[in-house]
A protein has these predicted regions:
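Alpha-helix C-terminal capping/helix-to-coil transition sites in glycosyltransferase folds
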Residues: 76-77, 195, 248
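Rossmann-like NAD(P)(H) cofactor-binding subdomain of soluble oxidoreductases
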Residues: 62, 67-76, 80-153, 169-171
Length: 334
């Protein structure tokens, strides 16, 4: 039986992933201050204990949530803050913030990059909100919101430079269906979470072009090698296991699952949609669109050869034909 935790926490964001995180916390009898900026969602939570727009079938125990549109009210008296909005909206979410976050544990569940800033969420919060690295954590791993919201078994990694911070977050989340481990590879798991979205776009493009499973296996193997080479060059540590869930597991589920929004975007591109029309077709943000530009810049800086990520960038930002770009890639994959 789950015991009630002493820490009070906040979740900033009201999409599918934020809703799944709130579900997990409330199942653990953890009270959550929840930043919800949408009036329809606020009303549905208060009246029916459901988020009417995202995971509308997911019941949220009303006794354990305090929804509010006031970010300062939401974070004021909490110990731990979860960031769970698309990366493109993070600065807008935090714009009204006057309360300091420096003495709180701030957990990024974003899996994205700040567009135009080219900083990871951890780097952004450290630089602009003065949250010390010891108070910053990343929560990542193979974790579709739809499955977490259904309480289906998932394995997540909480990474922080400070083991005590990681353990506190782990204790809040851990239960029978949400299993957490800890890591100190903060920048590595955060980079992997960003990169796998780009690679899911590549796989989606191949699916849209009607390449078969044999080729997809080779493509994803190439993605794993490319990611490993990039991590070793840009965030080198001695004990990283690229086959762990935070790296390989997240890559595989994002590339293979029909629930993956990045794969879905890639599939539209592979079927011949323009970038603009494919983005307009998406009902949720595909983080890989923003991440591709960042990975391109980083690979040029580190000198790592990344032909798969480069192919995605060419299609998204250089008006390359998805068919021609993928055909060129097939000639160098092994």
């Amino acid at each position: 039986m789950t015991v009630e935790k002493e820490s009070r926490c906040a979740v900033l964001g009201y999409g599918s992933w934020a809703t799944a995180i709130v579900k997990t916390l409330t199942v653990n009898h953890q009270h959550v201050n929840w930043l919800v900026l949408n009036d329809d969602i606020l009303k549905s939570l208060e009246e029916r204990s459901h988020n009417v727009k995202y995971l509308p079938w997911c019941y949220i125990d009303r006794d354990y949530i305090t929804p509010s549109k006031d970010i300062n009210e939401v974070v004021r008296d909490v110990d731990i803050v979860f960031l769970a909005m698309p990366s493109a909206f993070l600065t807008k979410f935090l714009e009204p913030l006057k309360e300091s976050l420096a003495d709180k544990i701030v957990v990024s569940a974003v899996k994205g990059i700040i567009p135009g800033d080219y900083l990871t969420i951890v780097e952004h919060m450290n630089r602009y909100y003065n949250v010390p690295m010891k108070n910053l954590a990343v929560m990542t791993g193979p974790s579709h919101a739809e499955e977490v919201g259904q309480c289906r078994l998932s394995y997540l990694t909480v990474a922080s430079e400070d083991n005590a911070s990681a353990e506190r977050v782990k204790e809040l989340l851990n239960n029978d269906f949400f299993r957490c481990s800890i890591s100190n590879d903060v920048l590595g798991v955060e980079a992997a979470a960003i990169m796998k979205n780009v690679y899911a776009l590549a796989v989606g493009i191949a699916v849209g072009l009607r390449y078969g499973d044999n080729f997809l296996a080779v493509l994803i193997s190439g993605c794993a090698n490319e990611m490993n080479n990039f991590l070793n060059a840009s965030v080198p540590i001695g004990n990283r296991n690229i086959n762990a869930a935070a790296y390989m597991g997240d890559l595989l589920v994002t590339c293979y699952s029909p629930l993956s929004r990045n794969r879905r975007l890639g599939t539209l591109l592979g079927k011949g949609c323009s970038v603009k029309s494919a983005l307009n077709e998406m009902t949720m943000v595909a983080e890989g669109y923003y991440a591709a530009e960042c990975i391109r810049r980083s690979s040029m800086h580190t000198g790592v050869d990344m032909p798969i990520a480069d192919m995605v960038w060419e299609v998204l930002y250089n008006n390359a034909s998805a068919r021609d770009a993928m055909l060129a890639l097939t000639k160098i994959l092994k």
